[in-house]
């Protein structure tokens, strides 16, 4: 019973960060800037969900704020970028489809955080 209670609370305390962006890519320089922004997201542990949507699991709100701050510090000069945090419970309720075929959502892997 304790494990069920802890897991339930954890689903509401752990978060997913979603980063949505639309960056200009008309010139070679703009494409390079957009590519560098994507690389920074990947280097910070984000995974590509769709081409301009990246996601990352965070064990706590404090951890999510650290990663959100890193995004703020690496914003390109032009383009539109949105950052949203949702609970693990909300993320688990997402319905995914490839065409008309439903797809199960991935469970976050166990992560070890060292300070």
Curated annotation (Swiss-Prot):
Signal peptide: none annotated. Keywords: Antiviral defense, Endonuclease, Hydrolase, Magnesium, Metal-binding, Nuclease. Mg(2+) binds at residue 22. One of its GO terms (biological process) is maintenance of CRISPR repeat elements. It comes from the Bacteria. Disulfide bonds: none annotated. This is CRISPR-associated endoribonuclease Cas2. It is an enzyme of class 3 (hydrolase). It comes from Flavobacterium psychrophilum (strain ATCC 49511 / DSM 21280 / CIP 103535 / JIP02/86). The gene is cas2. Coiled coil: none annotated. Belongs to the CRISPR-associated endoribonuclease Cas2 protein family. Homodimer, forms a heterotetramer with a Cas1 homodimer. CRISPR (clustered regularly interspaced short palindromic repeat), is an adaptive immune system that provides protection against mobile genetic elements (viruses, transposable elements and conjugative plasmids). CRISPR clusters contain sequences complementary to antecedent mobile elements and target invading nucleic acids. CRISPR clusters are transcribed and processed into CRISPR RNA (crRNA). Functions as a ssRNA-specific endoribonuclease. Involved in the integration of spacer DNA into the CRISPR cassette. Its cofactor is Mg(2+). HAMAP family: Cas2 (MF_01471). Its EC number is 3.1.-.-. GO terms for molecular function: metal ion binding; RNA endonuclease activity.
């Amino acid at each position: 019973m304790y494990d069920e209670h802890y897991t339930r609370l954890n689903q509401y305390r752990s978060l997913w960060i979603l980063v949505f962006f639309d960056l200009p890519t008309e010139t070679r320089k703009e494409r390079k800037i957009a590519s560098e922004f994507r690389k920074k997201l990947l280097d910070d542990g984000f995974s590509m969900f769709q081409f301009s949507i990246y996601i990352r699991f965070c064990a706590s709100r404090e951890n999510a704020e650290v990663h959100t701050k890193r995004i703020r510090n690496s914003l390109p000069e032009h383009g539109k970028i949105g950052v949203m945090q949702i609970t693990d419970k909300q993320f688990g309720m997402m319905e995914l489809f490839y065409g008309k075929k439903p797809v199960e959502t991935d469970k976050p892997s166990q992560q070890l955080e060292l300070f």
